Amino acid sequence: MPAAKRTPKVNRNPDLIRGVGKYSRSQMYHKRGLWAIKAKNGGVFPRHDAQPKVDAPVEKPAKFYPAEDVKKPLVNRRKPKPTKLKASITPGTVLIILAGRFKGKRVVFLKQLSSGLLLVTGPFKINGVPLRRVNQAYVIGTSTKIDISGVNTEKFDDKYFGKVAEKKKKKTEGEFFEAEKEEKKEIPQEKKEDQKTVDAALIKSIEAVPELKVYLGARFSLSQGMKPHELVF
């Protein structure tokens, strides 16, 4: 198909010489028909409102596309749900710890914290287990229960057991090769007093039941021939 011929634009007011047109300004006013436009709009030229400026985008579009397809991360709509407590664990239940530093120790369950962990204690005066948090996956609930109505556990939460983050200092060459043992971290006096208060309330309930103090002080273990799946705790 042949290309269409372009018609050259003709100037309505050709220049006689450079900068001087053939027709005057008033002649061009009538020649262009501006008088008719003015008469049509009540003797005033029509005005058009300025178009609103489009705001520049905050993020400029990418100039190049990635060579490989990039997976778009999905929105996580999962909401944290409170951890369901085992039916065998209720406030005052004696638990057996199965793992960790106090493996085999019997402890008293006080309450469940917001994180889902269990707040337990020995008491410390009987078997050396202080107030601590334990995951319910690592305990066995027994049928033995203790009255803990006299124990106040309102102040104990997850923040109570949190540790203060300390900035690590770079050791010099001399400090690195020193064989001196680091100083043991001392337990705050406030936590010691809290432990004594909880122990005092628990021991009153424990001493009211014969042989319960000896039971809590003894470590749980399996002897030869015992079948764990057949035991009744």
UniProtKB/Swiss-Prot annotation:
Protein known as: Large ribosomal subunit protein eL6z
Gene Ontology CC: one annotated term: plasma membrane
Record flagged with keyword Ribosomal protein: yes
Gene3D superfamilies, alphabetized: 2.30.30.30
Alphabetical list of InterPro entries matching this protein: 60S_ribosomal_eL6, Rib_uL2_dom2, Ribosomal_eL6_KOW, Ribosomal_uL6_N, Translation_prot_SH3-like_sf
GO BP terms: translation
Segments for region (Disordered): 175-195
Organism: Arabidopsis thaliana
Gene behind the chain: RPL6A
Signal is among the record's keywords: no
A Pfam entry, by short name: Ribosomal_L6e
Lineage: Eukaryota, Viridiplantae, Streptophyta, Embryophyta, Tracheophyta
Membership in a protein family: Belongs to the eukaryotic ribosomal protein eL6 family.
GO molecular function, one term: structural constituent of ribosome
Domain of life of the organism encoding this protein: Eukaryota
